[in-house]
């Protein structure tokens, strides 16, 4: 268990620093602080952070949810990183490496880093653990937090379950202790560091496909088939990377996949809906008004599947729609026209 440490800019023990003050980072910080812990929330825009401090709420993304008193708002990265041994990075995947590199000069000798970012490295499709090891070396403990969570429901204190994985069992136990709240927020331990990272990236892509299917008007049968076959693609890619099959039947796999594919709180699903209804990619993204992780994730997962030689027909068709201008309805027709095959393949 982490020892109390008040030797920081705040003069109090800080259980965790959350790096990233978007809707999800803010909701995780709120949830942690509700457990009675002192939590620092850092964001890169001083004006945004000043507004959060003045309002003691994030009215833009989490209306009606007030900040606990123990939540500290910070725009100074050095103070934030130095404040706690444990960092929780919650930023879009395409800036994960940039943000981690910015944190690097301020890391403590005992720093441990967990992330709730879902995605892969842009342009390479590498797992985020490999990005982290390249940037900060292998002397720091790393962990990943993943599962079916919508930011607003988490911030409101509605029941939620999630999983955490790390090669460091002590870090997992400490994260469970800090994050788990038996009344509303359940945290499961998982020992599959690879599979936990992969599930969050692939499900974003499949959610776009589910939205496209519904936008075209294909109905519940088609959506369910797409989710099921999407899970098969996720599992095949995971097997090629050495992940454990059971991970994809858990929170970071099936759980997150079903949530993101079936509820319109999901930006990825709403993005797909717009595409299925005939909007172009740029217009659909603009209407969402926030980062659509699945857009970049599609290219990342497609690149990884090509490199690993794993057949992922749903991912391939969505990639063609997003990056090659293919019509969404034609992509759906091409999926339906594929040759007969056994379900397990």
UniProtKB/Swiss-Prot annotation:
Binding site for sn-glycerol 3-phosphate: 118, 147, 149, 203, 256, 266-268
Catalytic activity as recorded in UniProt: sn-glycerol 3-phosphate + NAD(+) = dihydroxyacetone phosphate + NADH + H(+); sn-glycerol 3-phosphate + NADP(+) = dihydroxyacetone phosphate + NADPH + H(+)
Highest taxon in the source lineage: Bacteria
UniProt GO BP: carbohydrate metabolic process; glycerol-3-phosphate biosynthetic process; glycerol-3-phosphate catabolic process; glycerophospholipid biosynthetic process
Pathway entry: Membrane lipid metabolism; glycerophospholipid metabolism
GO MF terms, alphabetically ordered: glycerol-3-phosphate dehydrogenase [NAD(P)+] activity; NAD binding
Pfam family name, one: NAD_Gly3P_dh_C
Subcellular locations according to the entry: Cytoplasm
Record-level GO cellular component terms: cytosol
UniProt entry keywords in alphabetical sequence: Cytoplasm, Lipid biosynthesis, Lipid metabolism, NAD, NADP, Nucleotide-binding, Oxidoreductase, Phospholipid biosynthesis, Phospholipid metabolism
First-listed, main subcellular location of the protein, grouped into a coarse class: cytoplasm
Annotated catalytic residues: 203
Entry EC no(s): 1.1.1.94
Binding site for NADPH: 23-24, 44, 118, 151, 267, 291, 293
Role description: Catalyzes the reduction of the glycolytic intermediate dihydroxyacetone phosphate (DHAP) to sn-glycerol 3-phosphate (G3P), the key precursor for phospholipid synthesis.
HAMAP family: NAD_Glyc3P_dehydrog
UniProt similarity note: Belongs to the NAD-dependent glycerol-3-phosphate dehydrogenase family.
Protein name stated in the entry: Glycerol-3-phosphate dehydrogenase [NAD(P)+]
Organism: Vibrio parahaemolyticus serotype O3:K6 (strain RIMD 2210633)
Gene name of the encoded protein: gpsA
